[in-house]
Amino acid sequence: ARGEQDALRRANALSVLLTQLLGVRPEQQLPKIQDELRREILSLQDERDRLRRQIVKEYPEYAELVSQPVSLEQARKLLHGGEVLVTFYLGETESYVWAVDASGRVVFSPISASRSEIARSVQRLRRALDPGVDRIDAIPAFDLAEAYRLYGLLLSPVLELLQDARLLLLVPHADLGSLPFAILPTAPSVLGISGVEQFSAYRAVPWLARRLSIEQLPSVTALASLRRLPSRSAALSSFVGFGDPLFSAQQAKQASTKVGALASRGLPLQRRNVPQLAGVESASLALLPRLPDTGEEVRQIARVLNVDPAGAVFLNAEANEQRVLATDYTGRRVVMFATHGLVPGDLDGLTQPALALTSPEVVPGAGDGLLSMEEILGLKLDADWVVLSACNTAAAEEAGAEAVSGLGRAFFYAGARALLVSSWPVETVAARMLMTELFRRQVAQPQLGKAEALRQSMLALMDGPGYVDVKMGRTLYTYAHPLFWAPFVVIGD
């Protein structure tokens, strides 16, 4: 039975990936990769058919079990008090929202906007979140008017159900998957004057994050699957983290690597590098930028969780494919990968979403430097959290959506209960503060939900002291701009 399920889930995952590749613009088509995926899918389907015939013969009662779609009543029964499930569908001319709460109240409403119109709105908002600038004072103002317009468009039909809600379970569609709903204002807002502390005026904005905790879900069926998992003690225990892999021999020789920076009044803020592969005809691991700041982040989370780094923190050359595949994940409640997420076509021969690990040029014989979606499917996890802290896997690009769906689906199949992913390249100091605060809160309050722990950590960063110049004894800028506090989203339960 396990073999049949494995073949099915691999075929399903590859089929979704093939569908996504077929849906991109003609100039982005990858015919060779599509053909290879088709061959793999057919092979897996043949294997599954063979195994099913064997199961029917030897275990006829198992063959009678079939997956059923989640009905409205089943969806309601999945919910706890204070939870609201909201799903979207974006169409060519009109879109739709559907919501249900634990009491059984249901709302279904059209949205007077097409998929392309909503995509343009999302892209407009993301200009201030992923601006590609190199100075703090060059960060654009966040478009509060457009954000509130989108809030009204998407959520006004279901406001009645949200009035007393504490947790919004969100099933986004298309471009909505790259927009953290936490950044939507719940009332019209005009940005005031920040004064000496730059960005402090954003603290007065009535963000949705101040009212609700939010979890994203791949589907309603995924919620059903996750909530069927056996319960376990709330306290976090063991941890394993992989970070700052080395993608070339040159990186291995360098004591330090220059990273992208935002400079403010002479004080640099580091942003994590992202791969610059657009227009590159032939790409290898060596083109990927190193992520040196992620090593300290992995170590800090180990300290917060009171885990000995020896045997739990694998950085640089140790962050390799062989190490990942050989690790025993039994009891590892938090699994962290601080590296790049890649999609088909990013590198030569890459046919599946993958995580980039240390190159075989650095550690010969330790794998090909890629943890593919299919290899993730084969991991045996029982993790409350899988953290993808530097992947930018929820990016606005079609490729980013493909990465988060492919990698996310694989980790859920492998046994993860929730993912923590970023929606744009994070500012490294704020990201490290947010990440460690999140796990500090979960350790201090074991019953605290994942989404609520993230929400509280966001607010603490937003309302906190910000970047303090120790010599001057004052805050130069706060982390209240959503670029700093809103990149991470919880996907799962």
Describe these PLM feature segments.
Residues 16-19, 23, 46-49, 53-56, ...:
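Non-catalytic alpha-helical coupling and interface elements of nucleotide-dependent molecular machines
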Residues 8, 12, 42, 451-454:
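Conserved positions within tetratricopeptide repeat
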Residues 2, 20-24, 28, 90, ...:
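Charged/polar helix/coil "stalk" or linker segments at domain boundaries
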Residues 36-63:
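Amphipathic alpha-helical coiled-coil segments
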Residues 18-44:
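Short, Lys/Glu-rich amphipathic helical modules
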Residues 1-15:
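Short, charge/polar-rich alpha-helical segments
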Residues 36, 58-493:
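Catalytic cores of enzymes
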